[in-house]
Amino acid sequence: MTVYTGIDIVEIARIKRAVERWGDRFVQRIYSPAEIALCAGRINSLAARWAAKEAVAKLLGVGMRGPGSSAHSVAFRDIETLTDDDGRPTVTLSGAARARARELHIESICISLSHDHGLAIAVAVASTSPAARRRMPW
């Protein structure tokens, strides 16, 4: 089994400034409709999900798609962080993020989110199956 990790921390004020400056244009470019509904305008929650997207991108070994991005990048909305019935955060991948996870033989991604003292943080951990490890060339 192989384990991949990613971590990100963001100042909540940075996300607040982006929302104030760009409004719905920013929010709809970065977050899925389900994330927008779940966060209900709470900046702390939006910031935690920003950190989640960055943390997952790091474990995938890619950047986030924006101006001047490389072929090894994913769109922000390709990484969606919602909650399960028990309130635990979950990650759903689509598009280029899902394709990259398949390349890495990732079976599951767990994520933890937190925000306090003006910061939001996310830690993401992904694992592959033992069978996928046997297929790797090293």
Swiss-Prot record:
It holds the Pfam family ACPS. SUPFAM superfamilies: 4'-phosphopantetheinyl transferase. Gene3D superfamilies: 4'-phosphopantetheinyl transferase domain. Its cofactor is Mg(2+). One of its GO terms (molecular function) is holo-[acyl-carrier-protein] synthase activity. Mg(2+) binds at residues 8, 54. Signal peptide: none annotated. It is an enzyme of class 2 (transferase). Its EC number is 2.7.8.7. One of its GO terms (cellular component) is cytoplasm. The keyword Secreted does not apply. Its main location: cytoplasm. It catalyses: apo-[ACP] + CoA = holo-[ACP] + adenosine 3',5'-bisphosphate + H(+). InterPro entries: 4-PPantetheinyl_Trfase_dom, 4-PPantetheinyl_Trfase_dom_sf, ACPS, Ppantetheine-prot_Trfase_dom. Keywords: Cytoplasm, Fatty acid biosynthesis, Fatty acid metabolism, Lipid biosynthesis, Lipid metabolism, Magnesium, Metal-binding, Transferase. NCBIfam families: acpS, pantethn_trn. Transfers the 4'-phosphopantetheine moiety from coenzyme A to a Ser of acyl-carrier-protein. This is Holo-[acyl-carrier-protein] synthase. It comes from Roseiflexus sp. (strain RS-1). The lineage of its organism: Bacteria, Bacillati, Chloroflexota, Chloroflexia, Chloroflexales. The gene is acpS.
